[in-house]
Amino acid sequence: MWVGVISLFPEMFRSVTDFGVTSQAIKKGLLSIETWNPRDFTHDKHRTVDDRPYGGGPGMLMMVQPLRDAITAAREASPGKTKVIYLSPQGRTLNQAGVEELATNENLILICGRYEGVDERIIQSEVDEEWSIGDFVLTGGELPAMTLIDSVSRFVPGVLGDFASAEEDSFADGLLDCPHYTRPEVLDGKEVPSVLKSGNHKDIARWRMKQSLGRTWLRRPELLGNLALTDEQELLLAEFVREERQNSK
């Protein structure tokens, strides 16, 4: 996967390129990240990239010309058909389904806004999709872009040592993840559930599904409304709910 990033602060992306799973993916040649700074496309000595909005109001907007030229440069560098994304609070909220959808693209250009945003005509003429990471305000699009890169790159074949890790993560099947345990077997008097030490893979899978369903019911019940549970899942959830209510008495 190739990702081009348009940002006034390209140095921020070293946290993605130099560390963690994404860094390893780059070293393996599975992921490529290039950055373009609109300041490099200005024509004045101050390298101006912002201007006042028509109609007045607080704040500034990113100027059209440097931003458009940076996008053009990124398009020209892209190895193939490219989807251009603007990270924006007005965009579609990123969730696991959206991550998997974006992961089907081989090439992405991510535009990171600053100040009060960008000229609407840039969005209309240059942007294919707008995406948001939530209903809250940030100072720029860099952190959302890094979030998108991190989550999407997990679905690039070979990036994770075990692709099942991505498929079994929270939200991958619409549910929250089940609890996980490692050594020591007893910690502060609390033991690892015996089923996980049984070696019975069928029982372990059943326990994990039950816990996943139960945790979703407890913490994010609205997610269950979007799912068509199997008969077995319905039974497991009912069993969890019954036990939870008995334990709370």
Curated annotation (Swiss-Prot):
CDD domains: TrmD-like (cd18080). GO terms for cellular component: cytosol. It holds the Pfam family tRNA_m1G_MT. InterPro entries: Alpha/beta_knot_MTases, tRNA_m1G_MeTrfase_C_sf, tRNA_m1G_MeTrfase_TrmD, tRNA_m1G_MTases_N, tRNA_MeTrfase_TRMD/TRM10. GO terms for molecular function: tRNA (guanine(37)-N1)-methyltransferase activity. Keywords: Cytoplasm, Methyltransferase, S-adenosyl-L-methionine, Transferase, tRNA processing. Specifically methylates guanosine-37 in various tRNAs. This is tRNA (guanine-N(1)-)-methyltransferase. The lineage of its organism: Bacteria, Pseudomonadati, Pseudomonadota, Gammaproteobacteria, Vibrionales.
